[in-house]
A protein has these predicted regions:
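A structural boundary/capping signal
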Residues: 1-162
Length: 162
């Protein structure tokens, strides 16, 4: 299992690749990133993690908040560590579209990696779904795996060295 520092290093590297990539040339990284991008980019990040550490188990966490649970978010957890690479979307979205709790936590960093007990994610969002990702993504469709593989290759190709 990777350490929290290893996760921080790889997540920073990966978020940088997403920030600088040509979003017109990727299927899963959309041009309004990080807004409305949490699940797709978290899936790509899980692909990256499983490429580096094929024996780990990753949990994809879906959280909701707001009136009728209309505000959603998605992040990863490895063991007891939360990894969020799209929290900064809540700095961009208009405050009147968000809950007081989200606005009070501003500004959000582009990357949030913290032990679960120290993270604000479980304070702000109620977990409504968890899914497990392991090497090979047996619960994901082949088409989506191919999209991840293709975009991952493009992302990794944008920078030759860490």
């Amino acid at each position: 299992v990777p350490t929290i520092n290893e996760l921080r290093i790889e997540t920073s590297y990966f978020r940088n690749l997403i920030d600088i990539c040509d979003k017109n040339n990727t299927t899963l990284v959309i041009d309004c990133f990080p807004v409305m991008s949490c699940k797709l980019t978290s899936m790509l990040l899980s692909y990256h993690f499983l490429t580096l550490w094929p024996d780990i188990e990753i949990t994809g966490v879906s959280g909701v908040t707001g009136k009728n649970d209309t505000i959603t978010h998605y992040w990863l957890e490895v063991s007891n560590i939360v990894i969020d690479i799209t929290g900064d979307q809540y700095n961009i979205i208009n405050a009147n579209e968000l809950t007081k709790s989200i606005v009070m936590h501003r500004p959000f960093q582009p990357i949030h990696i913290e032990y679960r007990d120290c993270s604000y994610l479980h304070e702000i969002f109620r977990v409504n779904e968890r899914e497990t990702f392991i090497k090979g993504f047996p619960t994901i469709t082949e088409t989506f795996i191919e999209s991840m593989k293709l975009d991952y290759t493009k992302l990794i190709g944008t920078v030759k060295y860490k």
